[in-house]
A protein has these predicted regions:
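Sec/Tat signal peptide C-region and signal peptidase I cleavage site
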Residues: 36-41
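Bacterial N-terminal signal peptides that target proteins for export
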Residues: 4, 12-25
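Short pre-active-site segment immediately N-terminal to redox-active cysteine/selenocysteine motifs
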Residues: 59-62, 67-71, 128
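Non-catalytic, surface beta->alpha helical segment in thiol-disulfide oxidoreductase systems
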Residues: 81, 119, 123-165
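Bacterial N-terminal signal peptides
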Residues: 26-33
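Conserved redox-active cysteine motifs that mediate thiol-disulfide chemistry
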Residues: 67-83
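Thiol-based oxidoreductase modules, predominantly thioredoxin-like and allied folds used
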Residues: 44-45, 85-115
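A short beta-strand-turn-helix
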Residues: 44-62, 92
């Protein structure tokens, strides 16, 4: 609410400045609280040796996503329905090291990365996309998944079966 202090002097007073500041402070506190409670998205590594080492030292499983990120419809669907969901990100932060072995058609890719991904695809006999390989900390394959209906909840349940052996 604006109130003129004196006729003709052009000065105005904002009534309730104290309340306005209180509201701003409360809003800032809420934004900070919400922002700090959101867990960071897990990092998708591309270096196999680094990912394997991290899985071993952190005692987590290594999930390797063999994907055609810019052309494979099922890969894009898996990313949209599973990997981008908060419940998967939460699960991954606690239990997985994530690695993407991408086989793009339109995106440029470093020669060394392309070679590494091709060697991994041969090693794990990848026949199609998406293929998800799950390895233990010692690099032993404990499971293989692909796209499945049911979203993040179903996918996490399958990962839990593999994790618990």
């Amino acid at each position: 609410m604006l109130r003129v202090l004196a006729p003709g002097d052009g000065l105005v007073e904002v009534a309730g400045v104290k309340n306005y500041r209180s509201i701003l402070f409360a809003a800032a506190a809420i934004v900070f609280a919400v922002g700090s409670s959101v867990q960071a998205a897990p990092e998708w590594l591309t270096d196999y040796k680094k990912a394997q080492q991290e899985a071993k030292t952190s005692n987590r499983l290594l999930l390797v996503d063999f994907t055609g990120s810019d052309w494979c419809g099922w890969c894009i669907k898996l990313d949209k329905e599973v990997f981008s969901k908060p419940e998967f990100k939460d699960y991954a932060n606690k239990n997985l090291v994530l690695m993407e072995a991408d086989f793009p058609r339109a995106k440029a890719q470093a020669v060394g990365l392309k070679k590494q991904n091709q060697e991994l695809a041969q090693q794990y006999q990848i026949q199609g996309f998406p293929t998800i390989i799950v390895l233990n900390g010692d690099g032993q394959k404990i499971g293989e998944l692909g796209y499945m209906e049911g979203g993040a909840t179903t996918f996490i349940a399958e990962l839990e079966k593999l994790r618990k052996g």
